[in-house]
Amino acid sequence: MLKKCTKYISMILIALCLFPWIQVEASSTMTVRNQEELKSALENSNISTIVLGNDIETTEKINVMRPVTIDGNGHTMQYVGTFGDSDSSDNTIWSGIYVLQVYKTEATIRNIALTGGNGGLLINGAKVQLEGTIDLSGNGFGGIELGQGSGVESIAHVILTDQTTLVNRTDSEDRPTLWVPKDSTGSILEINGAQYELLPEEEFTLNEIEAFTISTENPETGDQIILYISGMFLCFSVALFAFYKLSKREKDYFL
């Protein structure tokens, strides 16, 4: 009887210990459906993952200033505010409007479309990993700016993996998918673990970014040639040594 009671008490204690952790896990993810809910979730440090429950329209730049994951869940964030002093809806009027800005922190952004701004995403002295499909179409000046604003000492760092797909149907030389402004000290583009240092005023279309991706998947470098030659030399050396030992053994046999 005592053993049975002890068993039940142990089960209850385990359940009580697990309960708070279950509660924390449940509260760390929030689904948002409008601009105000999104801003509120970004201000709540207990929320580690923000999921878009539907497409969201914004009238201001949305700032990410703490570590967080934003899961677009296949939805769109669209800036529908105005540009310039004339309150124009023309996003080719430069007003420094980005649909989303990640400022001096680390964040993960996945499966989202960012459209309607001067730029889709500003990585301002931050480190951002992009996952899934990131659609940057429909922005007036381009997709992603790797910037370093006034007073920001850290450089922008964007991470792409083999699970990242960039989409930009309005990509062009004048509206690149990725760029570094001239007032920056440079930035880092990381693709599948390989890091590339980008210089101020460098701009990259979608095809040029894809060229980086291809080079990391199929590197045609001098290192490969050296490795090939080294391998051939090793094989030749082993064969020569084996031939020498065999010849010596036959010579000793006849002697």
Regions found by a protein language model. Name each.
Residues 44, 57-69, 78-110, 115-128, ...:
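Extracellular beta-strand-rich solenoid/capping regions of secreted or surface-exposed proteins
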Residues 74-95, 110-117, 132-142, 158-176, ...:
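Beta-strand-rich solenoid/repeat architectures in extracellular/passenger domains
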Residues 19-30, 218-226, 244-247:
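Sec-dependent signal peptide cleavage junction
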Residues 27-53:
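Acidic Gly/Asp/Thr-rich repetitive segments characteristic of extracellular carbohydrate-active
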